[in-house]
Amino acid sequence: MKNKNKKKYAVACVTSMGLRITPENRMAVHNSNRFLLQATSAESNVLNVTSSLGPECLVLTRFVQGSPMAAFIKAQLRARNIAYVGPDVPQGGPWGYRHQFNIADSGFGLRAPRVWNDRAGEVGRTLDAKDYDTKQIFGKDGVKVLHLSGLIAAMSPETTKCCLKLAADAKKYGVLVSFDLNYRATFWKGREEELSTQFLPITDHLLQLDPASFALVTS
């Protein structure tokens, strides 16, 4: 007999997938001409540990149609035992949508690590809950935990609405919701109250980074 309580996905997350380039041998970016390319996002990085241990995980996102970078991201996710759901959005010309770049200097000695985010035109800022068949994902396939973070939730009014709607749908099917306070204060400038009034009530597991972040959402 099939176990009706069995969930297909251990953890699902809402995210905007991007690309990280890192100089070889801990060199500074401006001194380098060889870089390691990785598909990454704050939320999908949370899935990596679980998926590497065997349980399948799921990313809910958007891709740029026909983009070789989107194809690279999809291949990287498959290699990590992470499934993905999301539409391929037309680029809209050379000045249209793209996947964000994260340019990371790992630092060396007295030179501190440094990250430069290049996110103009980021396709993930347009996420829409309507893109996802929540009855299939949460109800039929099954998900144990839906993971959200303050980063994706704050990227745009659209991503805020998307996260809240998906969390509400997930809870209808008994899915636990986790929310981490990797919230990037600059993203929430002028909207800090939303963290405590909208996201805290829907959260089953709150992951804090520091006392100041915890105080912000619980004040």
Q: What are the language-model segments listed below?
A:
Residues M1-A12, A168-K172, T218-S219:
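Conserved phosphate-binding/catalytic region of the ribokinase-like
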Residues K2-P87, A129-K130:
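Glycine-rich phosphate/adenosyl-contacting loop at the front of the ribokinase-like
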Residues K8-Y9, G142-V143, T203:
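Local beta-strand N-terminus motif with an aromatic residue
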Residues C13-V14, G86, N117, V177-F179, ...:
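General beta-strand structural signal in soluble alpha/beta enzymes
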Residues M17-G18, F108, A120-V123, L151-A153, ...:
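Short glycine-rich anion-binding loops that position phosphate/pyrophosphate groups of nucleotides
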Residues L19, P23, R78, I82-V85, ...:
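Generic secondary-structure signature for well-ordered alpha-helical cores
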Residues V145-S219:
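Conserved beta-alpha-beta core of the PfkB/ribokinase-like small-molecule kinase fold
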